[in-house]
């Protein structure tokens, strides 16, 4: 009997850390101050004006926000400034403090570039291009340290720190405009020297994070999650190679950060396959979806059309959100979900004089035509609830769940009352519509 009790206690000790992991949900709101200052009009689902969007997000159950940081966005190309590149340190300190003062956690997203950093472009900041590799590593450390010191002094200490944005292929490849053959990418076929240079830069970034913000968790962010849309990622080859390289280089980090946009990354099943591999290969790491999105109106051009399952509509976006959350909640190591550019809202702006970007973004959580919050916004908080919305819960939904939500018979919560005929669960009862 004693051995059985001891075994049970050991088993509980093994699972309790996973079960007790705190979850975080919110979005990247890096342009929110610009929208507010320029006069964007925000409304809730019922059409009531939102005086303070950040407070509204908190009321909707969100508990964390993400903000990007560029080294010197004044040196970004004009086209990219028109896409929303403006987040210098002063801007980020102010927004970061607002987030912290609202009682939310802050994820700071270092881009280590003057403009967008992603798999297609990771250009060295203009003021750093003349440095050799050793000097560049030192600059990365000192810049990271100095930024974090200023953030702390301003009352905007980050809780999560991304040391690079979508750095699947490395970062700081070289000067913008340099010949392609002179850029130091980290592809599957790249020379080992490129990977060594990259991990040395990353080591200095993470070192500064530990020195200045020892309580913050470090995020390594990639986006190789598709086996159908990303040709170097068959059987998740690029994803596997990346984190194996990080292990070999002994990179210090806590969280695996991923991006997922169906129009670029394919089906949700592909994302889940990536998560399954990562949680098995790196059980000591947390996993966060640090960028996600899907359209509620007007499609975004990409390589994959998911409208056969999720139409471009408020309900389609809501159903996508419900299914994404249900999938993520099947994986205990997944502890974060952030919707990218959730604040985009053209309603109320004078397009000629007060526009924030030069084009609409159609996967935000506000309708650009009306300024109303989409249904998906209020669904995000479901990620924080323990348990999952699947078939196993139908009995609970039918017999005990006396709330105003609508569910399908397989346990999926709908963003609003169903518009198609069928059998649903509502207020604990089966209902025919």
Language model: regions and residue ranges:
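Sec-dependent N-terminal signal peptides
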Residues: 4-14
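Hydrophobic faces of well-ordered beta-strands that scaffold small-molecule active sites
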Residues: 25-29, 65-67, 106-110, 159-163, ...
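Aromatic-rich peripheral "rim/lid" segments of glycoside hydrolase catalytic domains that contact
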Residues: 42, 180-181, 273, 277-284, ...
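Glycoside hydrolase catalytic-domain groove-lining segments
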Residues: 51-54, 196, 211-218, 225, ...
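Substrate-binding cleft and catalytic face of glycoside hydrolase catalytic domains
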Residues: 56-194, 199-225
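Residue-level detector of functionally pivotal "anchor" positions at catalytic/ligand-binding pockets or at interdomain
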Residues: 387-410
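C-terminal tail/sorting-segment detector
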Residues: 421-433
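Boundary/entry segment of secreted carbohydrate-active catalytic domains
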Residues: 21-56
